[in-house]
């Protein structure tokens, strides 16, 4: 632990800013003015040491996941555009420099370097929406050593979270078998920034919309919504609540029918649906949020169909995940769409993916780590994917950058940033389309929720030989 020179070995680092002053100075939001400080302290102390000793030659770091989380057979690339936008705009402003100076840790020369800091490096990456597998490099950063070091925390924070959510969302979308899946997670997400990123990652993987209005404005994602039980309870009775809402929103009303009794609720919804039709409106859907979803959905569908309302859809919500959705559909639930919240936004069964960022090459040659259980692959690399005649992926090859396997392989990592500028920002719709195509191409056995097969990822002969030489020379 780094501490002030006058502190004892057990004293924690303290800044010149008191907790009371800090509490009144900033509400704690992360934005362009302070995101450069969203880093671990040792990134800055290491970088200052590099600066003092003239160690700022070009270096390459790789971001990768060591192993699949429990219950996962594949991962989905997400968060790249967010990360690249942060790299483009990364600045240490006057307030940040003032705070760092107050820590009495950093050399004046290094603080001057930070004041003029701009990220000038290159990034190669597996595009957003693409499926990938450990230990393939998700991205590689090649930049002056200090630049590449300083962005580690920011990249891991951004990529780990969005890959985690996208990979969970993909499983939910696949389990829904073509039925709509809506992100309804903001109130359960781990913070305001997380809620935005969840909506984006979920939309990439095929979710049809989000309840998060800010995400709709920011990313152009369709926004969706129903009503809460509190709305129904705010009126004299359920029928009055439904009628009022239908009058206010005659073209997109979704009625929550389980506040008191689901079958009584659908009876009231049928009354309102006929009243809406008489005035040119149309009831879009009813929502069931509790109880025996399977039995209730069948009964509600029967009631709606019997009333001539076959076009009215049924939306289910209530602690859903891919396992529950698959079970409901297997048992014949009558449902058109799912609203998923907590399980999606927190990836409850696999709440982290353990992505790491490691030095793999610099001007002195290959760099590597041999620690037991944490060994790394040296050198800049490319991932090559092989497909069968039907276009299904059948195996990946991790190779050194200058290797060229046979023509049946397709490279995955592409240039996404050069000279600190994004090469070609992609519209979110294009990323979403790519992900839909990639998920559709996966073999069924890889999409299984349980007991999925292990996808083959191998090392090229040259990379294997290099790793063997390194181990032998240790």
Regions found by a protein language model. Give the residues of each.
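Short active-site oxyanion
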Residues: 253-254, 312-314
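Short coil/turn segments at secondary-structure boundaries
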Residues: 99, 167-171, 185, 447-453
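N-terminal, Lys/Arg-enriched amphipathic/low-complexity engagement segments
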Residues: 59-115
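Residue-level "edge-of-site" marker
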Residues: 229, 317, 341
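Gly/Ser/Thr/Ala-enriched C-terminal appendages of enzymes
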Residues: 2-57, 70-72, 305-307, 312, ...
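Buried, small/hydrophobic-residue-enriched core segments of structured protein domains
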Residues: 4-58, 67-69, 105, 111-120, ...
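An N-terminal, globular interaction/scaffold subdomain
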Residues: 85-90, 125-128, 132
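Hydrophobic residues within beta-strands of alpha/beta enzymes
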Residues: 224, 286, 314, 336-338
């Amino acid at each position: 632990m780094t501490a002030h020179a006058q502190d004892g070995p057990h004293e924690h680092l303290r800044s010149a800013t008191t907790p009371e002053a800090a509490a009144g100075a900033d509400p704690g939001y992360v934005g362009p003015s302070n995101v450069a400080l969203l880093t671990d302290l040792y990134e800055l102390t290491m970088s200052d040491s590099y600066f003092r000793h003239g160690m700022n030659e070009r270096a390459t770091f790789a971001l990768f996941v060591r192993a699949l989380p429990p219950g996962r057979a594949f991962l989905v690339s997400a968060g790249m555009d967010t990360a690249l936008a942060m790299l483009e705009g990364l600045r240490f402003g006057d307030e940040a420099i003032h705070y760092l100076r107050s820590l009495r840790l950093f050399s004046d020369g290094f603080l001057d370097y930070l004041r003029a800091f701009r990220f000038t490096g290159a990034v190669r990456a597996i595009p957003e929406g693409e499926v990938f597998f450990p230990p393939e490099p998700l991205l590689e950063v090649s930049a002056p050593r200090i630049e590449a070091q300083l962005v580690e925390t920011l990249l891991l924070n951004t990529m780990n979270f969005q890959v985690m959510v996208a990979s969970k969302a993909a499983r939910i979308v696949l389990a829904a078998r073509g039925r709509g899946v809506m992100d309804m997670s903001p109130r359960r997400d781990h913070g305001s920034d997380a809620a935005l990123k969840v909506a984006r990652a979920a939309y990439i993987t095929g979710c049809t919309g989000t309840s998060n209005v800010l995400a709709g404005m920011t990313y152009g994602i369709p926004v969706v919504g129903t009503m809460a039980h509190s709305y129904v309870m705010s009126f004299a009775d359920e029928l009055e609540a439904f009628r009022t809402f239908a009058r206010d929103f005659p073209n997109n009303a979704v009625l929550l029918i389980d506040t008191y009794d689901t079958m009584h609720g659908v009876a009231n919804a049928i009354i309102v649906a006929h009243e809406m039709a008489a005035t040119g409106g149309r009831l879009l859907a009813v929502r069931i949020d509790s109880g025996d979803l399977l039995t209730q959905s069948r009964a509600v569908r029967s009631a709606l169909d019997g009333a001539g309302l076959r076009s009215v859809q049924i939306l289910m919500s209530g602690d859903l995940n891919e396992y529950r959705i698959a079970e409901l559909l297997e048992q014949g639930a009558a449902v058109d769409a799912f609203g998923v919240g907590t399980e999606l936004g927190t990836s409850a069964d696999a709440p982290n993916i353990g992505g790491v960022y490691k030095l793999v090459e610099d001007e002195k040659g290959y760099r590597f780590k041999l620690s037991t259980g944490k060994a790394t692959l040296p050198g800049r690399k490319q991932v090559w994917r092989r497909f069968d005649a039907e276009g299904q992926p059948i195996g990946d090859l991790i190779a050194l950058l200058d290797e060229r396997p046979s023509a049946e392989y397709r490279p995955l990592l592409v240039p996404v940033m050069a000279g600190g500028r994004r090469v070609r920002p992609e519209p979110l719709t294009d990323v979403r389309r790519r992900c839909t195509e990639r998920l559709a191409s996966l073999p069924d056995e890889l999409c299984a929720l349980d007991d999925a097969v292990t996808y083959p990822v191998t090392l090229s002969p040259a990379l294997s030989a290099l790793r063997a030489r390194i181990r032998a020379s240790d």
